[in-house]
């Protein structure tokens, strides 16, 4: 029986690398996988999903799914699922329930203010299985929050969606997110 999976985690938890490795595992077993991302997410270029570790794969846009013939696909994997609309998540449910194709969606649970993204909210509501992809804060505790860093400080105001990658965000535990404590990062990228 096909299921809808939502695998969420803070930034830098290797969600994208995990998604690409799951694709690899399916393909190693001669299974056909469709990789998907919202068109809004374009930092790696159109139709490319790329992890911070350097893994990459081609993809289609979520906005195209409803017009595609999914016959023959064994799995659909969605990256950056927090950016999906309610209608797009409903279509993922259709793929699972009516077409019998498992869907594995990866994304952030909440934004830098601690509020749900729309796509994540609906995935949390409708997924058959919800799994956390873990990473750690600078202090060594589990990071569950995404801090937006502006001028070396944790931002508390601003638009929900500002695409920028690890130069603008740091994963923190809730205690350090609430305190605005970036520890050794001081607003630098994960690579510094």
Describe each model-derived feature in a short phrase.
Residues 127:
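Short basic (Lys/Arg) and small-residue
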Residues 25, 94-95:
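Alpha-helical scaffold elements within enzyme catalytic domains, especially in hydrolases
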Residues 96-118:
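Sensor-1/coupling segment of RecA-like P-loop NTPase cores
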Residues 136-162:
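Short recognition patches in nucleic-acid-associated and regulatory proteins
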Residues 1-71, 111-122, 132-135, 154-156, ...:
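Conserved P-loop
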Residues 79-81, 107-108:
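Walker B catalytic acidic pair
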Residues 81-92, 112-117:
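Conserved ATPase-coupling elements of RecA-like P-loop NTPase cores
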């Amino acid at each position: 029986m096909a299921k809808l999976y939502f695998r969420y985690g803070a930034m830098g938890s290797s969600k994208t690398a995990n998604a690409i490795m799951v694709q690899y595992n399916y393909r190693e077993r001669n299974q056909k996988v469709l990789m998907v991302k919202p068109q809004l997410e374009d930092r790696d270029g159109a139709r490319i999903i790329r992890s911070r570790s350097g893994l990459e794969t081609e993809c289609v846009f979520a906005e195209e799914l409803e017009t595609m013939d999914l016959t023959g696909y064994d799995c659909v994997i969605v990256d950056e699922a927090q950016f999906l609309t309610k209608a797009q998540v409903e279509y993922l449910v259709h793929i699972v329930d009516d077409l019998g194709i498992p869907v594995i969606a990866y994304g952030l649970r909440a934004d830098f203010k601690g509020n749900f993204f729309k796509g994540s909210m609906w995935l949390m509501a409708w997924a058959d299985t919800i799994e956390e992809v873990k990473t750690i804060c600078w202090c060594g505790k589990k990071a569950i929050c995404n801090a937006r860093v502006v001028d070396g400080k944790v931002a508390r105001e601003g638009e929900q969606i500002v695409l920028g990658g690890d130069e603008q965000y740091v994963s923190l535990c809730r205690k350090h997110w609430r305190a605005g404590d970036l520890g050794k990062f001081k607003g630098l990228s994960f690579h510094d």
